[in-house]
């Protein structure tokens, strides 16, 4: 059986990157929450 995690930097960026977050209202809410919490890293 193959493992479920097959790392790919391209897919990682596209799905969880900053621009992907900014593209949707919910994503912007996530960034807002992470800024409020003081996260050093906002997105992948």
Curated annotation (Swiss-Prot):
Residues 16-44 are annotated as: Disordered. The keyword Ribonucleoprotein applies. NCBIfam families: rpmH_bact. GO terms for biological process: translation. The keyword Ribosomal protein applies. Signal peptide: none annotated. This is Large ribosomal subunit protein bL34. It comes from the Bacteria. Residues 30-44 have a biased composition (Basic residues). GO terms for cellular component: ribonucleoprotein complex; ribosome. GO terms for molecular function: structural constituent of ribosome. Gene3D superfamilies: 1.10.287.3980. Belongs to the bacterial ribosomal protein bL34 family. Keywords: Ribonucleoprotein, Ribosomal protein.
């Amino acid at each position: 059986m193959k493992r479920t995690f097959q790392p790919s930097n391209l897919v990682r960026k596209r799905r969880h990157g900053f621009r992907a977050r900014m593209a949707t209202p919910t994503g912007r809410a996530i960034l807002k929450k992470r800024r409020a919490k003081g996260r050093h890293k906002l997105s992948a």
